[in-house]
Amino acid sequence: MAVAQELYSFPASKLDSFVAQWLQPTREWKEEVLETVQTVEQFLRQENFRGERGPAQDVRVLKVLKVGCFGNGTVLRSTTDVELVVFLSCFHSFQEEAKHHQAVLRLIQKRMSYCRDLLDLGLSNLSVIEEVPSSLIFTIQTRETWEPITVTIVPAFRALGPSCPNSAEVYVNLIKANGYPGNFSPSFSELQRSFVKHRPTKLKSLLRLVKHWYQQYVRDKCPRANLPPLYALELLTVYAWEAGTQEDSNFRLDEGLATVMELLQDHELLCIYWTKYYTLQHPVIERFVRRQLKGERPIILDPADPTHNVAQGYRWDIVAQRASQCLKQDCCYDDRDAPVPSWTVKRAPDIQVTVQQWGHPDLILWVNPYEPIKKLKEKIRLSRGYSGLQRLSFQEPGGQRQLIRSQCSLAYYGIFCDTQICLLDTISPEIQVFVKNPDGGSHAYAIHPLDFVLSLKQQIEDRQGLQSQEQQLEFQGRVLEDWFDFKSYGIQDSITIILSRKREGKAPSAPS
């Protein structure tokens, strides 16, 4: 195609014209394609599917949804691939869908092969594709020009009905279903479509430009490589626009293109997610998302399906190489032959860090996960004026409290979403110890190695209300005696001491 060679030689200042002239589809083409696909939709809505195997009841179509580029308004000129998600009455849960998915696909395939209206459109290549999730794919032809169109059908459980557009319970059920990542994403296709569909027209132009580049200069050049899906590039582009322009609809396409290319070069740092459709206030969802964000990067979580990292397992190194080449072309250089400036976009969004310290109000800071911890400590020092040694620690639900080291970053500890950090201000030779409570939580305390154990119990009583005579402290299986010092037990910096309510039968042990 001539267009494939033209983008790299097109002036950066004229990319708007490039999109309008070469990438924007004509109204006539879109109408011809959609009119043809409407025949498929009518077949699905009118047919009452029932087979000898699989679901025991009749299978009715609840809704047919156009997804992908035809659904979200970012279709490229002459695109001939249409995706349909079909919500079915026989699926009442994610588990039922997983159980009957293949049987339903075979049933639709069988009925479709006898449909006269589709046969009149040259129905061919009808087959089930074993992907994630499995789908039915076939080719038909437009009525006017007889152009071949590839249609993909994916059956899905309608998890989000009109009464619960984004219920936390739905996402808890999704997590508990424990499906293969992406297997149940079609259930959330309405949200996926809305995430892009209602964006400004200028952003859709940038999306078309990025997708055109990806198809012509990456996919076509490396047809056998395991490359990321277009959806991952779309989400990355949306993130670049949100973070780089503060969602301004008036921006330069060349700057947007250069920004996306630079992000692709830094793919190993990307950790991107949204909480537009679900909340981290629910403990099950919070624990799951935090675990997701600790995975190998790049991480781009589907905004509608947090179980699916759409960037996982692909050859991003190839995409990065192609992005580097793109940045050297005319489309990324201005009229003075200088590189087009890119937007300031962090490789992971800033997060809210709540700094907690006993006896002080919480301190709220916005921090980037890739910033060195020493920068965070400097922000705390400027806010609170501490002169002692700052000891920071954190504890995730169900985990152990960990010391945060100055030379590391929050990203090093896998922290990419809002978190709480404990601050302890110590003065040498004081050390920090973690005291783990019976409920699994823990607190940090400052102690002098030569202080008695009783001094720590008094701190615990002041903070937590449990009287010192009712406390039992253990370290390495030994109950600590009130009138011995910490050094005699070999207690060193940042170790964990177990707190429990004193019970009969286990006597304190003196140091050996």
From Swiss-Prot:
Residues covered by the Ubiquitin-like domain: 351-430, 431-507
Domain of life: Eukaryota
InterPro entries, per database record: 2-5-oligoAdlate_synth_1_dom2/C, 2-5OAS_C_CS, NT_2-5OAS_ClassI-CCAase, NT_sf, Ubiquitin-like_dom, Ubiquitin-like_domsf
Pfam families named in the record: OAS1_C, ubiquitin
UniProt entry tagged with the keyword Cell cycle: no
Principal location: nucleus
Record note on quaternary structure: Specifically interacts with the ligand binding domain of the thyroid receptor (TR). TRIP14 does not require the presence of thyroid hormone for its interaction. Binds MBD1.
Function: Does not have 2'-5'-OAS activity, but can bind double-stranded RNA. Displays antiviral activity via an alternative antiviral pathway independent of RNase L.
Recorded family membership: Belongs to the 2-5A synthase family.
Name the record gives this protein: 2'-5'-oligoadenylate synthase-like protein 1
Gene: Oasl
